[in-house]
């Protein structure tokens, strides 16, 4: 059952929250030995939360919007009583979290049932979730391939039918990449939209949090439940709630929709270009739009990511570098050694860059681009080729996402299934101006309703 069917089934009494919970736990038990999406399961908590929903329904109470819906979170979200690993060996020695992360609190208030924590790249520094401490998360559509990252467990858990909803983080593409490679829906909200309090940071000035889901409705319901100001999070600049569910079915009539060319075409393989072409045709988009300074924006994002990420872990890099995984330790060290002038220059450029990007949206409401250059490569792949150019695999997965998140724009990643692509999915980015998540979701709903974007479980 999809998100809406689960919620309606519980509300109507056709099924119980406990039955839904037990079915999800059974699916996890049957599949996760191969997929490796989960790093912990909160079984007792899940059953207690599900039972509480069933009690409320039996009393005739009006149920909250996500009542009984199972979900799981990337293991950089605090879960009360659980150590927040952030994909690392180093964090194993930390005490258990004393409280849930704010977004987990808000989903609990909305009635969702937490089933556990999910695998990720160490400290969120990666695009593949080939974690050497906890093992690689495998793509449910071909278990010899990566699930993407750094929120790989969050994408794989949905694609494997383990949960209909998950939470991830996105600094340079870490929601959109696994959504693309696993064939699920993902939403990276506007920078500053959702509270980050109670999560383990990576790059404070770029980190975003958001949902992955089995449907556009799932994204919208979860997103609305998590919205709200947080005066205790200096990075949360949202001043009000802007519900997306009431406008989700308004369609795209009158919206100005363009297709990103240049960098976003040159760095997209045949399947990615085909996915965009079909989405553009469906959404009535024919004009090509050029995103300003995409390559420089990506380079500046790399500088800031390495610098902030490295400095955050400086003490551990000095005394226990051997406890970092090989895929991240060298990048953290190089980030610490970068001249501060590089960091300052990148941040100054970012202000100008945002202004240039925002100017695009004077003429356009939605812009379409591929989410990843190719579909999921095999686990262990070191190099990929895109249109005749050879790229190192791991950073190349973010070629098309980094320029967008660096500008802070909201994006929906829509799962499409191009022909002649070995049966593998690839995502399409639906991008809007800051604070216009609902436009992305509306366009996604059109792609879903026409069958262009969908899940295959």
UniProtKB/Swiss-Prot annotation:
GO molecular function terms attached to this record: biuret amidohydrolase activity
Species of origin: Pseudomonas sp. (strain ADP)
Family stated for the protein in its record: Belongs to the amidase family.
Catalysed reactions, semicolon-separated: 1-carboxybiuret + H2O = urea-1,3-dicarboxylate + NH4(+)
InterPro entries noted in UniProt: Amidase, Amidase_dom, AS_sf, Carboxybiuret_hydro_AtzE
The protein, known as: 1-carboxybiuret hydrolase subunit AtzE
Species classification: Bacteria, Pseudomonadati, Pseudomonadota, Gammaproteobacteria, Pseudomonadales
Keywords per UniProt: Hydrolase, Plasmid
Record NCBIfam families: amido_AtzE, PRK09201.1
Gene: atzE
Presence of the UniProt keyword Magnesium in the record: no
Quaternary structure note: Heterotetramer consisting of 2 AtzE and 2 AtzG subunits.
One BP annotation, GO: atrazine catabolic process
Leading EC class: hydrolase
Entry EC no(s): 3.5.1.131
Domain of life: Bacteria
SS bond partners: none
Stated role: Hydrolyzes 1-carboxybiuret to urea-1,3-dicarboxylate and NH(3).
UniProt-annotated catalytic positions: 74 (charge relay system), 150 (charge relay system), 174 (acyl-ester intermediate)
Pathway terms, separated by semicolons: Xenobiotic degradation; atrazine degradation
This protein's record includes keyword Metal-binding: no
């Amino acid at each position: 059952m999809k998100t809406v069917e689960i919620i309606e089934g519980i509300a109507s009494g056709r099924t119980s929250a406990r039955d839904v919970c037990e079915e999800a736990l059974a699916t996890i038990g049957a599949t996760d030995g191969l997929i490796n999406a989960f790093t912990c399961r909160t079984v007792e908590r899940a059953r207690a939360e599900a039972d509480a929903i069933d009690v409320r329904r039996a009393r005739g109470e009006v149920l909250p919007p996500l009542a009984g819906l199972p979900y799981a979170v990337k293991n950089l979200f605090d879960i009360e009583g659980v150590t927040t690993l952030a994909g690392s060996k180093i964090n194993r020695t930390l005490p258990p979290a004393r409280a849930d992360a704010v977004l987990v609190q808000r989903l609990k208030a909305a009635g969702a049932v937490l089933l556990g924590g999910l695998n990720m790249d160490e400290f969120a520094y990666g695009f593949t979730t080939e974690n050497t401490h906890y093992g690689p998360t495998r793509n449910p559509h071909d278990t010899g391939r990566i699930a993407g990252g750094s929120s790989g467990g969050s994408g794989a858990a949905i694609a494997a039918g383990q949960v209909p909803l998950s939470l991830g983080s996105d600094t340079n593409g870490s929601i959109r990449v696994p959504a693309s490679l696993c064939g699920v829906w993902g939403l990276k909200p506007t920078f500053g939209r959702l509270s980050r309090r109670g999560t383990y940071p990576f790059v404070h000035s770029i980190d975003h949090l958001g949902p992955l889901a089995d449907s556009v409705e799932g994204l919208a319901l979860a997103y609305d439940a998590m919205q709200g100001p947080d005066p205790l999070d200096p990075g949360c600049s949202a001043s009000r709630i802007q519900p997306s569910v009431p406008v989700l079915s308004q369609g795209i009539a009158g919206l100005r929709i363009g297709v990103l060319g240049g960098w976003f075409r040159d760095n997209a393989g045949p399947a990615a270009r085909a996915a965009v072409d079909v989405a553009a045709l469906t959404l009535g988009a024919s004009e090509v739009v050029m995103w300003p300074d995409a390559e420089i924006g990506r380079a500046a994002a790399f500088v800031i990511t390495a610098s902030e990420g490295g400095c955050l872990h400086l003490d551990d890099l000095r005394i226990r570098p051997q406890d970092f995984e090989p895929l991240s330790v060298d990048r953290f060290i190089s980030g610490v050694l970068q001249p501060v002038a590089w960091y300052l220059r990148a941040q100054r450029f970012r202000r100008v860059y945002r202004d240039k990007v925002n100017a695009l949206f004077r003429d356009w409401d939605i812009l379409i681009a591929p989410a990843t250059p190719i579909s999921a490569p095999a686990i262990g792949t070191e190099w990929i080729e895109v249109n005749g150019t050879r790229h190192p695999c791991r950073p190349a997965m973010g070629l098309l996402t980094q320029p967008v998140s660096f500008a802070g724009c909201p994006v929906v990643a829509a799962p499409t299934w191009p022909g002649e692509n070995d049966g593998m999915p690839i995502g399409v980015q639906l991008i809007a101006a800051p604070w216009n998540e609902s436009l992305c979701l509306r366009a996604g709903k059109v792609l879903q309703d026409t069958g262009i974007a969908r899940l295959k479980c």
